[in-house]
Amino acid sequence: MGEKITAKVETITPEIAKTMLGENVNNRRISRDNVNLFAREIRNGEWRFNGEAIKFGKDGRLLDGQHRLLAVIAADKPLTTLVIRGLEDETQQTMDSGKTRTLGDVLTLRGEKKSTQLASLARAVYLADQLGMEAAAQNDLKPTRGEIISFIDQTPQLADVLAASRAFRSQSGDMLTSSMFASLWWTFAHIDTDAANRFFTSLASGANLQADDPILILRNTLMAQLHKAGRSTRDNRVRIAALTIKAWNKWRKGKPLRQLKFSAGESFPTPR
């Protein structure tokens, strides 16, 4: 290839991507989550030409771009991108050393206020809205930035979520994470907005509740595990969501509650 460095915009088909990946030696460990995320963006038409390049060394070795190439294959759709060839192999050590632009960064560029909080809550609400509360608590799926931005643009009610989250946190502290609160409030508000506001106001304050009130039982349960290790694990997130839904269902029926449990293997409750 010689000493010359070339840069050219090329259309990478799945077949070309496979050939390029054949020159992949000593590249980063593959993140399947990232591959799947990029593939969804390509499939959805969300991928935009932004100047990021697939890079090859002087000897033809792939230095950067394996996740994008794998995503082209997974999406089974072509991608137009910049391809740079002829780089020194040592330059691979400096690649991807900059800070990745987050969804919060993108929202800031759009002029959104409280962009970091909006990004976090919008993602949680999106999962609850599209897949249900159990999936939101599991937090396994990684929506694309395009999916979340589209959801934000189409969901002005997210302003209500932000306001409710701030009000709850100011009274309750860390009883529920902001993301957990947002997804639960959204789910309950779709059933009865006024009831959802009253439920979480009482949960935050704990005022004027009878000993067998489901909200008080839930509050005591959440406060007891507030500082325990493992609170943010997947299983515990699912447990907290399930307990909150159980308390909500009992409270909506006007039924007393003595004990609140969610056992391993138990079906996730449906909010009513």
Residue map of PLM features:
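Solvent-exposed functional surfaces
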Residues: A75-R272
